[in-house]
From Swiss-Prot:
<dbReference type="GO" id="GO:0006888">
    <property type="term" value="P:endoplasmic reticulum to Golgi vesicle-mediated transport"/>
</dbReference>
<feature type="coiled-coil region">
    <location>
        <begin position="195"/>
        <end position="216"/>
    </location>
</feature>
<keyword id="KW-0175">Coiled coil</keyword>
<dbReference type="GO" id="GO:0000398">
    <property type="term" value="P:mRNA splicing, via spliceosome"/>
</dbReference>
<dbReference type="GO" id="GO:0090158">
    <property type="term" value="P:endoplasmic reticulum membrane organization"/>
</dbReference>
<feature type="modified residue" description="Phosphoserine">
    <location>
        <position position="127"/>
    </location>
</feature>
<dbReference type="InterPro" id="IPR029704">
    <property type="entry name" value="STEEP-like"/>
</dbReference>
<dbReference type="GO" id="GO:0005737">
    <property type="term" value="C:cytoplasm"/>
</dbReference>
<protein>
    <recommendedName>
        <fullName>STING ER exit protein</fullName>
    </recommendedName>
</protein>
<feature type="region of interest" description="Disordered">
    <location>
        <begin position="215"/>
        <end position="247"/>
    </location>
</feature>
<comment type="function">
    <text>Molecular adapter that stimulates membrane curvature formation and subsequent endoplasmic reticulum exit site (ERES) establishment by recruiting PI3K complex I, leading to COPII vesicle-mediated transport.</text>
</comment>
<keyword id="KW-0597">Phosphoprotein</keyword>
<dbReference type="GO" id="GO:0071013">
    <property type="term" value="C:catalytic step 2 spliceosome"/>
</dbReference>
<comment type="similarity">
    <text>Belongs to the STEEP1 family.</text>
</comment>
Length: 247
């Protein structure tokens, strides 16, 4: 079994961003087609619930809101069995992008707007149908017993690199107060990979050292053969200097 060596990397932690979610004054909701549909000063769960159709009630006198929809409503009549087969008149407003019904009013100039059930999502890409199915499955089956959590255990996750091989990343998070935390991640690699990389680096370093030594001596590897030939030739005779010369 190959040995595992860890090395540290720099990473960012998004845990602190969740601390400021409650301080946001406005909440943005989107249609199922990811088109922005509602800006509200509170969450939809805080609005009154209409039990007849599970719609949320927005009163313009109590909550600041901005609705985005098709300005031309569609008038429909609904028969309510719970109210003695009464007829309810609705002016339904659709999404500008996908024409999905989002809101309805009992009169076009009313200050009370009803948000239809599961028509809006908080984040783009959410699927309310999947959430409903998951909630029903959780309600019908008993949840398994939770495993005891380890207090000091690291959080392990996997990252797939460019070669398609999974690299294990271990994250250690340390809380530094209410609004601060430090996360240190380590990547676990096999010792064979690290050894191969070190050998390649050592070969490159040795080649650079040899080249520098040859440059100091006066040439490169290609000049060694030429230098040996020049060294074999006899040195030139020195010119004699002076006024008294023997003849």
């Amino acid at each position: 079994m190959p040995k595992v060596v860890s090395r540290s990397i720099v990473c960012s932690d998004t845990k602190d961003q969740e601390e400021y979610n409650e301080e946001k004054p406005l909440n943005i909701y989107y249609c199922l087609c990811n088109k922005m549909a509602l800006i509200l000063d509170c969450t939809l769960e805080q609005l009154p619930l209409r039990e007849v159709d599970n719609a949320r009630v927005i009163n313009a006198n109590d909550h600041a809101n901005k609705l985005t929809h098709n300005p031309t409503p569609r008038m429909v009549y609904i028969k309510r069995k719970s109210r003695g087969n009464g007829i309810e008149k609705q002016y339904r407003y659709k999404c500008r992008s996908c024409s999905l019904p989002l809101y309805y009013r009992h009169s076009p100039d009313s200050h009370v707007t009803f948000v239809m059930s599961n028509a809006l999502i908080r984040n783009k890409g959410e699927s309310p149908l999947t959430q409903l199915l998951n909630s029903e499955i959780k309600g019908s089956f008993k949840a398994p017993a939770a495993k005891p959590a380890t207090s000091a255990g690291p959080d392990d996750s996997g990252i797939v690199d460019a070669s398609g091989k999974k690299v294990v990343v271990t994250r250690h998070t340390k809380n530094m107060g209410k609004f601060s935390s430090v996360t240190v991640s380590t990547i676990d690699e096999e010792e064979d990979e690290i050894e191969a990389r070190e050998i390649a680096d050592s070969y490159a370093n040795n080649a650079r050292i040899i080249e520098k030594q040859l440059q100091r001596k006066g040439g490169k590897l290609s000049d060694v053969g030429i230098k040996t030939k020049t060294e074999d030739a006899p040195p030139p005779q020195k010119k004699q200097r002076g006024t008294l010369l023997e003849r």
